[in-house]
Amino acid sequence: MGSIQNTVHYCCVSRDNQIMYAYNNAGDHRNNESLAALCLEKTPPFHKWYFETRGKKTFGFLMKDDFVYFAIVDDVFKKSSVLDFLEKLRDELKEANKKNSRGSFSGSISFSNVQDQIVRRLIASLEFDHTCLPLSSPSIDGAEQSYASNSKAPLLGRSNKQDKKKGRDHAHSLRGIEIEEHRKSNDRGNVTECSNASSESATYVPRRGRSGGSQSIERKWRRQVKIVLAIDIAICLTLLGVWLAICHGIECTRS
């Protein structure tokens, strides 16, 4: 292990919170094991892979086929490189299991027969690729930082100040949304009232026109009736006068 630096501190494979294989670098074994146990208990659900950096160490997860592939590495590695390391670890362990079981791979990996030299070789490849890689572009770093911040899950806890600040920001944003919705609701109410008022005024004018027209027709009808009655009365009076003149009053009735 002379060429292997202390950059990959720990890696393991677990299933149902039971560690089936673990590689612990020649450092603080107990500290690495306790950190791994704490992180595996809080494995983020609904993720295919997940990373979080704390205290110059990156904690990487790869969830595949009911297994969790976990690693604790220094934060000098890109997250994409650590993900590639975990995927190669998964493939190498499956291949080793196939060889040990003479090709009868049943879906469950037997890690007791896996040699540490496989993991050492993968760690050496990871460190070699890191030393040969050029400086990462800002776009790649920004994308990785954006993913880490968006999918953040509190593996090792979070400070109360950050929680309070995010809570206040969330409350302010909700308050702003409520005020905006209230303003939009008032605007919609004013528009509705104006449209109702305009429609009522538009319908009110024709009603007045219809009532005025019926009243004028009624007045004309009454005037015509009065004229007809006056003509009838005049004719009746004329006939009565002629009859009285011929009969010299009411003498015709006496005979």
UniProtKB/Swiss-Prot annotation:
Membrane topology: Single-pass type IV membrane protein
Coiled coil: none
Domain Longin: 12-115
Primary localization class, coarse: membrane
Keyword Translocase on entry: no
Keywords: Coiled coil, Membrane, Protein transport, Transmembrane, Transmembrane helix, Transport
Comp. bias intervals (Polar residues): 188-202
Gene3D superfamilies on file: Longin domain
Region (Disordered): 151-216
Biological-process GO terms, alphabetical: protein transport
SUPFAM superfamilies: SNARE-like (SSF64356)
Name the record gives this protein: Phytolongin Phyl1.2
